[in-house]
């Protein structure tokens, strides 16, 4: 435990920020899982709408520094591929 007053304050601030970021990351993962459930159910309309939500949250997380920009782009690319496979016409 810190003894200096400013260090005590920083510890409280760090804990608040950690909890906030954990909540945001959890929300992000939930939106991605919702998309993957829609893909598993082969529901193209639901998959498209949940993909928009997931992409928006990924972009927001990347802009806020919650995740790296390249990580967000990689995840978006993988989600788009899943949607393209689902919505491709069966030959």
From Swiss-Prot:
It comes from the Bacteria. Keywords: Ribonucleoprotein, Ribosomal protein, RNA-binding, rRNA-binding. InterPro entries: Ribosomal_bS20 (IPR002583), Ribosomal_bS20_sf (IPR036510). Residues 1-28 are annotated as: Disordered. One of its GO terms (cellular component) is cytosol. The keyword Zinc does not apply. It holds the Pfam family Ribosomal_S20p. One of its GO terms (biological process) is translation. Residues 7-23 have a biased composition (Basic residues). Binds directly to 16S ribosomal RNA. NCBIfam families: S20 (TIGR00029). Belongs to the bacterial ribosomal protein bS20 family. This is Small ribosomal subunit protein bS20. The gene is rpsT.
């Amino acid at each position: 435990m810190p003894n200096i007053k400013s260090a005590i304050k920083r510890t409280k601030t760090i804990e608040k920020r950690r909890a906030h970021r954990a909540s945001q990351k959890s929300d992000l993962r939930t939106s991605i899982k919702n998309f993957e459930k829609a893909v598993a159910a082969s529901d193209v309309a639901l998959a498209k709408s949940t993909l928009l939500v997931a992409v928006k949250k990924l972009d927001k997380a990347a802009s806020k520094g919650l995740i790296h920009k390249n990580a967000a782009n990689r995840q978006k690319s993988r989600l788009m591929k899943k949607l393209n496979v689902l919505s491709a016409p069966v030959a």
